UniProtKB/Swiss-Prot annotation:
It is a single-pass type I membrane protein. Keywords: Glycoprotein, Hydrolase, Membrane, Metal-binding, Metalloprotease, Protease, Signal, Transmembrane, Transmembrane helix. Metalloprotease. It is found in: Membrane. Residues 23-400 are extracellular. Its EC number is 3.4.-.-. It comes from Caenorhabditis elegans. Glycans are attached at N247. Its cofactor is Mn(2+); Co(2+). Residues 1-22 form the signal peptide. This is Metalloprotease TIKI homolog. Its main location: membrane. PANTHER family: METALLOPROTEASE TIKI (PTHR31120), METALLOPROTEASE TIKI HOMOLOG (PTHR31120:SF6). It comes from the Eukaryota.
Amino acid sequence: MTFYILVVSLYLSLFLVTVVQSDCDTDVEQRERNIFLWSVKHPQFASSQGYLFGTIHVPFTEVWKEVSDRVRDAFAVSDTVLLEIDLHDEATIHELIACKNLAYDETVHSYLSIELLERIEKIMEYLRSSFLAWAQKQNPRDTKKIKHAEDIYNNIIGDWWRKRPIWLLFLLYQMCENVFEKSSSPLLDLYIAQRATDEKKTIIPIETAEEQCNPVVSVSTNEIIFAIEHTVHYFEDKILDNPSKDNESRSSLKELVEHYKCGTLKEDMFDKDGMSIIDYATGTTERFKADEINKKLKQDIFVKRNLRMAKRIEKILKGRNSNTVFSAIGAGHFFGSSSVLTYLEESGFIVQKLKNTDVIQPLRSPYRQTAKFKRVWTKETAVRRKSIIIEEVAPSSSRIARLWLVPCIFLLHSIFAIFP
């Protein structure tokens, strides 16, 4: 109901979320479990086979045990892997890192009022104190922990005053979570990308760095500032004034992740709590403005983006004869009447939701691929993390992993853990 809830849903398509231990309902039969895998085939292109896998943007070690063997099979027989963006291209990575900031000579002073700026400064100081307190609590005598906390603050939050409006908004939401609780393991999406590289599969990005950098095009700067103000209000009300409610604010995210792991994620969960900011919009004019912003954000992040992704997936599937294509994008893009699946069906594709009991049939002999598949997906110690972790050099500190920069866009690798 607050703008915070809306940003939660968006952030699940671009960034990270806190993960909880699996506590699935054992009564849910395996055949009913949603494994977030669909087969896609066009009658006129029988020599090509596509698989769509709905990912979640959390460390792969947190969800790996729950990933169905059918997903592993589909990846094993694939020749081509479609990802939201190519994170192995240096130019792309540099563009993603740079795009969140304003021009060199600009700061947030150019678009924030003095009053709002001071409120954000108070929040940032609270976060810095929290980081240092956490580090000291871990081991009071370990100066490296405290230094590590300082580095993380400087790297992730330190240059907040240079952020573009939309990225300041995303940053404020991210700060509602405990950065230190996040695993250093690669995200599931990045893990798949690294496995595809190791297997010498063809990798094709579905979106460009420019599209990832600018996920919201219909919302004006003034509207984003309006959203920032309400997010700041949420932070002040739920966290600064009531620290004990901090964990409550994260429950919806944890619930989404838990349902993903258990295969019980349903479409109506994405509309839980309304995804609205009108709780803090008291006047009639404010309520109308909040509603208009909500509509624009949903249109940009879900409807327009799903259509764009579906068209590109369609083009790739039709253009790769005798190939098996494995697409890994945020699971949220497969829900709703304007989903990627809906658009593909409207384009003549036969889309089938797969179950654990289904059998993946390769187009060609699977022997070579199966051998590699077993090494890739079972020998976790072989993961080369450095090649799939985006890092940024802080001006006065060591290099700190900037996993949260991975878009999704993701937006929303799509805001979200669920949407990329």
